[in-house]
Amino acid sequence: MSEQTLENFDEVNETNAEMDEQISEEPHKDRLIAAIHKEKIMAAIDNPKAKEDIDLLKEALSAYEYWIKSIKSLTTSGIQKVDDMTRLLNGYKDYLEVDLIASKGSDFLKRQKGQLKLDNSVMEEFLIHLVDPSILSNLPGFDLEPGPKTAFMSLAFRPSSISKLNEKPEVVIKDKDQDFTIGKTIHYKFSPDSNFNSRSTLSGKLHLAVLAAECKVNYDKTMFQECAGTAARLKYGCPIAKYFVLVEYLDMQAEDVRMTEIDNVFLLRKAKRLPFEKRSSLAEVRNQHKEHPIHTEVVLKFVNEIQNFINTKWYDPAAAISRGSFI
């Protein structure tokens, strides 16, 4: 790989220092980006069960910092920037998942990397960087809060008796963690009192996700069914919402998502999961990463879905007559 794709990690610390000097003050939007994957590395470092892997995880942390600074230092835009970002993503994932975890990790780390979210959190953080004016046009002037969120699913009123109707409302809000969302925090107040007296007012907030995506390293039939259920619940609470799944390795037969509320499943590596007997082989894992990198073409399909969604007017009942239909 080229230097841009994180090939030479022996000089990561020196390169990090140089890049600190080169990168000027970040735009406000960039400073809001959550270090989702970094948090998982730090949590693993603090995990007593991973004490054999402390040095390895510290190497991963240095590589992470280099990866993020490399993304932020890109001066390209549009398709070229997505291609550059995908190349950097492949470089970092190859180093983390093959050169570090698969090659040097303890049995605990190899078995529990999914549970520790050391692998799929990379993709979660990568997606946040796609929601940027250098890639997407017509973004609004406010923060779309991209990233993992606990997203609103449904709301119901549940008064326990007739006398309770004049008291603080009893409200049941259902929500669910999503790996990636685009949306907005909504603040609410419910009260039988028009002056919103504090004793009879229920207030709170929820995250309204208008676009959500699930990130999976491996994807089987059970996961597909779970995603279908989540998509249906998400759209029950927000009918205009979009729901996607981004998968690295497929572990099932492809199905017609039109039979569900899932808008699409993107196969990032265009690859199936390794057979069970090959998953512990370093050579097989390394070869799979080499032969099946994450494809810019597939990432762009997801970016185009976001762009089309941004450009579309989601609901315009005033135009029903001229359109000739309700929607």
Which residue stretches match the model-derived regions?
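Short His-Asn-centered micro-motif
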Residues: 213-218, 245-249
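Glycine-rich, often proline-containing surface loops adjacent to acidic residues and nearby aromatics
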Residues: 105-110, 206-214
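Active-site-adjacent loop/helix micro-motif of nuclease/hydrolase catalytic cores
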Residues: 189-194, 218-229, 236
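C-terminal tail/extension regions appended to the core domain(s) of diverse proteins
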Residues: 1-121, 133-147, 151-159, 163-165, ...
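Short amphipathic alpha-helical segments
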Residues: 119-127, 223
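Active-site metal-binding core of divalent-cation-utilizing nuclease and nuclease-like domains
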Residues: 147-203
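Conserved catalytic cores of phosphodiester-cleaving nucleases, focusing on short active-site segments
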Residues: 180, 209-217, 227
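Short, catalytically relevant binding-site loops at active-site mouths
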Residues: 187, 219-220, 250-253
